[in-house]
UniProtKB/Swiss-Prot annotation:
Biased composition (Acidic residues): 78-88
A GO biological-process term: mitotic spindle assembly checkpoint signaling
Record-level GO cellular component terms: cytosol; nucleus
Keywords for this protein: Nucleus
Gene: ypi1
Listed name of the protein: Type 1 phosphatases regulator ypi1
Cytoplasm listed as a keyword: no
One Pfam family in the UniProt entry: PPI_Ypi1
Protein location: Nucleus
Stated family: Belongs to the YPI1 family.
Coiled-coil zones: none
Amino acid sequence: MELTRPLGDISSSATVTIESTEESASISHEESENVLHLQPEPVRRVRWTVSTVDNEHMNKKKSKVCCIFHKQRKFDESSSDSDSDSDSDSSCSSCCSRNAYERA
């Protein structure tokens, strides 16, 4: 930081330059420097309850309800209006008429 000012009245041409030391500036800078300490979020883990059913060892052949996707229709749209989906609906076996517990 430099300060420059003329000495005496306007007719004189001498100037004095005052330089401040950087040590005092750096000390005040270190004091005003804030440090933020961040804590990591706790690790989220899946926890199973006692009432959780194990589907892997229940001798089920498959866990999917049905392998064919049925497109949702609007309320006023009939099922006979579908274009090419009607062919795929006929290939669905009787597995879709029963729920997953009845098929097991």
